[in-house]
């Protein structure tokens, strides 16, 4: 299986749109762009992405880690966390979801591509 379908969970609209544009230019299909943890859970179940790019600090009652935990209850979908800042306690909470990676904002598209390539390569090797 190769990563083709990506769900973006990002509450900063400009970052979400930039990510969507860059991923599309790289040949990926962005199946959805949502801004909250609750929307992420619904979209993950309905859209069945190959991977979720999840902001850790989301507006609202649920952060990205809590949303990832809920998504992973139903089925395994790889998560790559996006964050501008993460403390040790937050990183430990995130690690419990076995993420495929962390991207610190601002990040270069090559860093995102490296994670996506690694993920695809590991799946192809299985």
Region locations from a protein language model:
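Non-catalytic signal-transmission and effector/linker regions of two-component phosphorelay proteins
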Residues: 1-5, 110-126
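Two-component/phosphorelay signaling modules centered on CheY-like receiver
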Residues: 12-32
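Acidic, metal-coordinating helix/loop segments flanking the phosphotransfer/catalytic sites
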Residues: 20, 33-51
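Acidic catalytic/metal-coordinating carboxylates
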Residues: 36, 62-66
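Active-site residues of response regulator receiver
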Residues: 55-56, 83
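Short amphipathic alpha-helix used as the core "switch/output" element in two-component signaling
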Residues: 65-77
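Alpha4 helix (beta4-alpha4-beta5 surface) of REC/receiver domains from two-component response regulators
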Residues: 73, 80, 86-104, 114, ...
